UniProtKB/Swiss-Prot annotation:
Domain of life: Bacteria
One Pfam short name: NifW
Protein name per the record: Nitrogenase-stabilizing/protective protein NifW
Gene Ontology biological process: nitrogen fixation
Gene that this polypeptide is encoded by: nifW
Family under the similarity heading: Belongs to the NifW family.
């Protein structure tokens, strides 16, 4: 049986994915680990706002949040998702290839 005590002992992305028995591609996790965990962390915070959930309901909601976070990065990437501030700011010192023209 999965418990919040067991859940709170988990450390890395693979631990969470294995705990919830979510099949995963190691390469996808290696490339997007921090982004997956950041999105999952937001999902956990949303679940925790609902204080009326039972332990089982929380675990189920956490699993859904992790599945969603992982699946997002199967079809997308960090630049598209803009999870971290570095991807949210437009850098002024960058010239895009589309802005270069040949005369």
């Amino acid at each position: 049986m999965k418990t919040l005590k067991n859940f709170n002992e988990l450390v890395d992305a693979e631990d969470f994915l294995n705990f919830f028995e979510i099949p995963f591609d190691q390469t996808t996790v290696n490339v997007n680990r921090l982004h997956i965990l950041k999105v999952f962390s937001s999902a956990i915070a949303e679940v925790d706002e609902n204080t009326k959930l039972t332990e089982t309901e929380k675990i189920t909601a956490y699993k859904a949040g992790l599945e969603s976070a992982y699946k997002t990065f199967l079809t997308s990437n960090a630049q598209e998702q803009k999870v971290f501030p570095v991807f949210q700011k437009e850098h002024k010192d960058v010239v895009k290839l589309t802005e270069i023209s040949a005369e």
